[in-house]
Amino acid sequence: METAIEKNWEVYALKYAERVDRTRSDSFIFDDHSHQGHTIDYFIWVLKSKKDIIVVDTGYDYDEAKRRDRPIQRAPSEALKAINVEANDVTDVIITHLHYDHAGGLKDFPNAKFHLQETEMAYATGPCMCHETIKMPFTGEHVCEMV
């Protein structure tokens, strides 16, 4: 039996935070211009059809913002209201990778089916997490939630 693929989708980028007080060394491990300013905006993506609402990455929430001393304008789940979507209505969540700013709001989407590459799960639960620099962008609780 063949499943019909929805042809009409709306795609939204929803900003939930920005960080202006950072340098390139905050983003890159090795960089010749490490002291230059490097502003970053934080977004989640939403794909919306008649049948499905898909969120790509869940961003980070207020607790994670406080823990990491990061600014936050609104929780990503709250940002959905700008496009008339409630977090409970999200059918699927695609996590591109398990860094805190991509997987910090997993609990906010209780009815969604989650999708993550098997290799990312293996990496985030593997021996590389013994290295401080590599594990810094991961939050153990988020990885455990995905497991």
Regions found by a protein language model. Give the residues of each.
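Zn-dependent metallo-beta-lactamase
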Residues: 1-53, 60-62
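Metallo-beta-lactamase
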Residues: 2-4, 74-85, 89, 119-147
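A structural signal for short, well-ordered beta-strand segments and their strand-loop junctions
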Residues: 13, 55, 114-116
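Surface-exposed, flexible loop/turn segments at secondary-structure boundaries
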Residues: 19, 101, 122
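Residue-level marker for buried hydrophobic side chains located in beta-strands
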Residues: 54-56, 94
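Short loop/turn segments at strand-loop or loop-helix junctions that form parts
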Residues: 57-59, 119
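A generic structural signal for short coil/turn motifs at secondary-structure boundaries
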Residues: 63-67
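Active-site metal-binding motif and surrounding structural segment of the metallo-beta-lactamase
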Residues: 70-116
